[in-house]
Amino acid sequence: QNPNRFIGLM
């Protein structure tokens, strides 16, 4: 999974 996906939740 991409770390960018976590930023999307923010």
From Swiss-Prot:
Gene Ontology CC: one annotated term: extracellular region
Gene Ontology terms describing biological process: defense response; neuropeptide signaling pathway
Record-linked InterPro entries: Tachy_Neuro_lke_CS (IPR013055)
Pyrrolidone carboxylic acid modified-residue sites: Q1
Keyword Membrane: no
Tissues expressed in: Expressed by the skin glands.
Protein name: Phyllomedusin
Species annotation: Phyllomedusa bicolor (Two-colored leaf frog)
